[in-house]
Amino acid sequence: MSIAIVDDDDVVREAMECFVLSLGHSVSTFGSAEEFLNSEQISRTSCLITDLHMPGLSGLDLQDRLIATGHRFRIISITGYPDEDVRVRAMKAGAIAFLSKPFNTDRLIGYLDKALKAA
């Protein structure tokens, strides 16, 4: 099963990639929502970890586009700018988790396990 990570922050994206790889998962990373949407990886993704606040399309915009195009994999939303309205919108649109940066890696592991079991 493949996990995609979308985050415009190189340091965060690379750290998450190393962490998820250390758990034994296949990982692809993208610096923007647009890059992910235009990739062939989209059809092989089982779980998406996406930042919510990015230039161009936000993580919420990405989630909306994925739903509109029939992609139904599990989404874990992360943000450095936690906001209750944004959390509610992400969860109502189908995200299985909303994590504020910095987040506890044990929580991420739990959400990844949940996402991949449901995939």
Task: Give the label of every model feature segment.
Residues 38, 60-72:
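Short amphipathic alpha-helix used as the core "switch/output" element in two-component signaling
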Residues 51, 79:
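Active-site residues of response regulator receiver
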